[in-house]
Amino acid sequence: YAKDLTEFFAQTPKPCLTSTKSWLNQTPYISRRRKKAQAIRAFSAWAAEHAITGFEWWRQVPIAKEKQLPQTTATKDDYAQAIKRTKNSRDKAIIETLWSTGLRRGELCALLAEDIDFLAGFVLVRTSKTGKPRIVPLSLPAKRAIRVHLQGRKTNSVFGITPNGVRLLLQRLNAPSAHAWRRGWAVHALRNGVSETSVRAAAGWTSGAMVARYTSALSGELAVEEFQRAWLEYNLLG
């Protein structure tokens, strides 16, 4: 916050609520405007803790709301097309793993050979965003693809690729981003009857907020399909 507060005091020597709002509105990007407003709010809290008066109005500084744009979700068709475009066993195994597990890029790249349990059918994610290890079920196509890829490999890393390498691979395959595959995995699982509790555990989410977001997206998707079927039946009958 130091940089934003330094800039703020330099440009508004005698700040008030009106001048502060004007200063914030000079920033075109909502994300930056939010951060600046948060810095001012944080200073207000610090001032209150240290019994410094005269800054109570800072708490009224509005924090701009970011627009929640629809996010891309990988579909069955994306999966099928990406598999067709792969040119080697490693790339195919990566696509199968993304579709089967919904792993984050960093988690995918960190997988070691001993993390794959082919008999039980799961992968062990040792390093995750939450810092807690977890197991994620592995589909039969993913197991087969990984087995083929690992044949003859001498390194312990399953894929031997960096997160940026995964990004470039997906671009080369004209496929959705890794996070879109994660969303697609969650929606596909929920669509096929996997419980929200199981999806949350496999994804490594500590709360149900993310699952609720995907459930909402799935509800909208199913509603569209139902309407399309109804219109098709209406047109056929008509």
Give the label of every model feature segment.
Residues 229-238:
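C-terminal secondary-structure termini that scaffold catalytic or DNA-interacting sites
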Residues 174-193:
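Short basic/aromatic active-site micro-motif
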Residues 53-55, 65-81, 130-140, 153-159, ...:
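DNA breakage-rejoining catalytic core of tyrosine-based enzymes
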Residues 73, 127-130, 203-228:
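Catalytic-site neighborhood detector that most strongly recognizes the C-terminal catalytic loop/helix
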Residues 76-105, 109, 130, 182:
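Basic, Lys/Arg- and aromatic-enriched nucleic-acid-binding interface segment
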Residues 101, 110-148, 209, 216:
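Conserved tyrosine-mediated DNA breakage-rejoining catalytic core shared by Y-recombinases
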Residues 2-70, 149-153, 172-174:
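N-terminal core-binding DNA-recognition domain of tyrosine recombinases/integrases
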Residues 139-180:
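Active-site/catalytic core of tyrosine-dependent DNA strand-transfer enzymes
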